[in-house]
């Protein structure tokens, strides 16, 4: 990669990102702009995938809201994400947990990792 691009992206990388993997439960504090106001919206769910490296890395969080599955993809180094909290570490054997989309209720639970 071009050294100039590397220098610019290095300044934009965040260093306050916790270590989390697919299967972990996270609480994402996202900044939402509504007209003139800016507020923090919580999005809590299971990380079903992480993708990419560097400034373009993303992760997808899935939660069930009113019986409907909701997935939201966040850029890992986005300034719109105020903070990421890991609430629970899950033990899974896959990097992409797309199979959770077909599961409901107790079948969609993920075993907690023993640390």
Swiss-Prot record:
Coiled coil: none annotated. The keyword Ribosomal protein applies. PROSITE patterns: RIBOSOMAL_L19. Signal peptide: none annotated. One of its GO terms (molecular function) is structural constituent of ribosome. This protein is located at the 30S-50S ribosomal subunit interface and may play a role in the structure and function of the aminoacyl-tRNA binding site. This is Large ribosomal subunit protein bL19. It comes from Lacticaseibacillus paracasei (strain ATCC 334 / BCRC 17002 / CCUG 31169 / CIP 107868 / KCTC 3260 / NRRL B-441) (Lactobacillus paracasei).
């Amino acid at each position: 990669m071009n050294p100039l691009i590397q220098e610019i992206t290095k300044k934009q990388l965040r260093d306050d990102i916790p270590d989390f993997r697919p299967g972990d439960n996270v609480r994402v504090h996202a900044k939402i702009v509504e007209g003139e106001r800016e507020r923090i919206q919580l999005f809590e769910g299971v990380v079903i995938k992480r993708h990419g490296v560097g400034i373009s890395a993303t992760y997808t969080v899935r939660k069930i809201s009113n019986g409907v599955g909701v997935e939201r993809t966040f850029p890992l180094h986005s300034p719109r994400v105020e903070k990421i909290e890991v609430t629970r570490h899950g033990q899974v054997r896959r990097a992409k947990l797309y199979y959770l989309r077909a599961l409901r209720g107790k079948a969609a639970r993920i075993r907690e990792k023993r640390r």
